[in-house]
Each structure stands twice: as C-alpha cells, then as structure tokens.
Design a protein with these regions (language model features):
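Thiamine diphosphate
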Residues: 1-105
C-alpha cells in the first residue's frame, strides 16, 4: 500500500496542487490526507464523477495547472462522456491525473 502522506508530498513537489473527486472507501486515507494537507480552495468534493471531470477541466482552463481527479472504479462510467469530450487531443486536450480506487469484487 502506498503511504498517502508520501504520495501527497510527491504530487505537491510536482506541482499537482488542485484535487477534485468523489470520496472512496479504498482511497479514504488519501482523501483524509488531501483534506488535511491541501489548501481549502484547492480541494473540491464533487457530487459525482462526471462533475469532478468538468471541475478539473475548468481548473485547467483557468489556471493552466494539471488537476488531480480521484474516484472509485464504479464511477468510471459516469465520467466517460466528459472525459471523451474534454480530454481528447483533437478537442480541448485537457490533461489531468486520475487516481481510481479499484475494488476487487
């Protein structure tokens, strides 16, 4: 298991400073770390995964930074359309780092 504090610090060193996502029980330690260590204005808990992608896209367009999006694997279906339309290289080409908790069913 990755230590969430070390992982967060590594992200921060690489200028990944904005976080948005839907909390996941598998990522609960990382979510707690993000909540405690990031600036209040740099962390948004989204209502659903598609919203998280949209918020991340808006952050990139307004700041030119690369946001971090976190979610559970069951939420991937909710973000297919925003991902396909906003991150596609021939459309808006918006980068984002995605962290997806993977439950083994």
């Amino acid at each position: 298991m990755i230590n969430p504090e070390i992982f967060f610090d590594q992200l921060h060193e690489r200028e990944f400073d904005f976080f948005v996502g839907v909390p996941d029980s598998l990522l609960k330690n990382l979510c707690a770390c993000i909540t405690s260590k990031s600036h209040q204005n740099n962390h948004i808990i989204a209502a659903n995964e598609g919203n998280a992608i949209g918020i991340a896209a808006g952050i990139h367009l307004s700041t030119q930074t690369i946001p971090v999006v976190y979610m559970q694997n069951s939420g991937l279906g909710n973000c297919v359309n925003p991902l396909a339309s906003l991150t596609h290289p021939d459309i808006y080409n918006i980068p984002m780092l995605m962290i997806i908790g993977w439950s083994q069913l």
